[in-house]
Amino acid sequence: MYRVVYTKRAVKDIKNLKSAKLDNKARELIEIVKNNPFQNPPFYEKLVGNLYGAYSRRINIQHRFVYEIIEQPHVYNETDYDGIVKI
């Protein structure tokens, strides 16, 4: 299991997802990524360019969320994690 950390931008975007009624779909995808960031389906894309090293998953045709995986096992609040997923 991976620990999910939200960036400031992601926290702001959550409000937009709620207004577009996409927050439930986004939560489902985040749970999938939390358990296994490389799980298929739903499919993920490796990004290139400025976002090299990051991955994305589609919320719908127009929206997607981008995340970065930091493969570094650690303990947080007495829970063992395989790494961090930064959204």
Protein language model regions, located:
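A short, surface-exposed loop/turn module that caps and links secondary-structure elements
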Residues: 31-58
